């Protein structure tokens, strides 16, 4: 597959009360990750009869150890914001002056004293 790139699309599913991260990989000859669809019934984001959902790329991160990572937001098949798309809701609330991100905390302890 010379000339192909692999992208790992990452999104939040529709499970309640807490969403989980989902991902799937696409091989394509596109220089940038294209929009992609998925079956939302398996992620609690659609009913079985009309289960198409769209993954819209928001940000791509190069990964020297494998697939480029594509952070996405979920839209319904008609390109409207999906109810599980919290990013769109947050984006509507803030201006360019705000920063939104994740924080991870670490605690260092002395193994002798605990």
PLM regions and their residue ranges:
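ATP/Mg2+-dependent ligation/transfer catalytic cores
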Residues: 1-114
């Amino acid at each position: 597959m010379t000339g192909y790139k692999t992208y790992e699309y990452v999104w939040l599913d529709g499970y309640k009360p807490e969403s989980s991260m989902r991902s799937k990989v696409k091989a394509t000859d596109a220089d940038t990750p294209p929009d992609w669809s998925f079956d939302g019934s398996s992620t609690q984001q659609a009913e079985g009869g009309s289960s198409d959902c769209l993954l819209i790329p928001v940000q791509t991160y190069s990964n020297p150890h494998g697939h480029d990572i594509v952070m996405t937001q979920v839209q319904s098949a008609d390109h409207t914001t999906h109810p599980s798309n919290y990013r769109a809701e947050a984006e509507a609330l803030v201006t360019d002056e705000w920063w939104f991100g994740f924080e991870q905390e670490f605690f260092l302890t002395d193994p002798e004293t605990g």
